[in-house]
């Protein structure tokens, strides 16, 4: 009977020792797993933070490019525009070019095709080093322009000329030299996108924009 009790206590002792060792190993393994998890989490957070920093830098770079783009190619909508000088004289009329909507370099949905530095580059003449001060591009079908020219003539500021007023606002790009005194090929223009009624002299395609229309 005593031997049985001794054996029983001995077995219990071994069991407790086994549980203690097992518990210790389990705690060590759990601590190791937690430590590894913390390390992975720390590395992930560090990587995520670095990615965010790089993304922020990329975003800042994009915003900078957009800012530079808008600074170099200003597109604005003035409340009123009064044209006051021509590139060859001071008759308060502007030379104009009518663009058909099928014009290959013009897409109504693409504002960059309306950017004046691009449009005016085709107007620069190698023998004339003076930049054209102002110019208007009319983005309408030729038939629409011809229809204006068939309307009754109205008074305009062009001496000895006959002008005709459009029945509706036209889609226009008004290009104005950003600073006076510029010479080709370094002509920098400000771009105005307009929808205005126009007065047009159909014999020489000079245009005046109607203020407030």
Swiss-Prot record:
Main location (coarse class): secreted
Compartment annotation: Secreted
Pfam families per UniProt: RnaseA
GO cellular component: a single term: extracellular region
KW Secreted (keyword) present: yes
Superkingdom: Eukaryota
Signal peptide: 1-24
Organs and tissues of expression: Male-specific expression in proximal caput of the epididymis.
Function in brief: Secreted proximal epididymal protein required for post-testicular sperm maturation and male fertility. May be involved in sperm adhesion to the egg zona pellucida. Does not have ribonuclease activity.
Record-stated family: Belongs to the pancreatic ribonuclease family.
Miscellaneous information on this protein: Represents 34% of the proteins secreted by the epididymis and 89% of the proteins secreted by the proximal caput.
Protein name: Inactive ribonuclease-like protein 10
Organism (species): Sus scrofa (Pig)
Gene: RNASE10
């Amino acid at each position: 009977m005593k031997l049985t009790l001794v054996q029983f206590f001995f077995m219990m002792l071994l069991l407790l020792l086994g549980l203690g060792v097992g518990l210790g190993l389990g705690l060590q393994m759990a601590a190791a797993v937690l430590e590894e998890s913390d390390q992975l989490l720390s590395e992930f957070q560090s990587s995520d933070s670095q990615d965010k920093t790089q993304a922020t830098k990329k975003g800042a770079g994009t915003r900078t490019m957009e800012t530079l783009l808008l600074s170099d190619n200003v597109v604005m909508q003035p409340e009123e525009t009064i044209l006051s000088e021509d590139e060859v004289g001071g008759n308060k009329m502007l030379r104009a070019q009518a663009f058909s909507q099928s014009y290959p370099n013009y897409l109504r949905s693409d504002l960059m095709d309306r950017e004046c530095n691009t449009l005016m580059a085709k107007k620069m003449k190698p023998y004339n080093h003076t930049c054209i001060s102002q110019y208007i591009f009319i983005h309408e079908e030729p038939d629409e322009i011809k229809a204006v020219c068939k309307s009754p003539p109205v008074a305009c500021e062009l001496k000895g000329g006959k002008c005709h007023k459009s029945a509706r606002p036209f889609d226009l790009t008004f290009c104005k030299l950003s600073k006076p005194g510029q010479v080709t090929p370094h002509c920098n223009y400000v771009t105005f996108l307009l929808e205005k009624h126009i007065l047009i002299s159909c014999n020489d395609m000079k245009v005046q924009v109607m203020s407030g229309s």
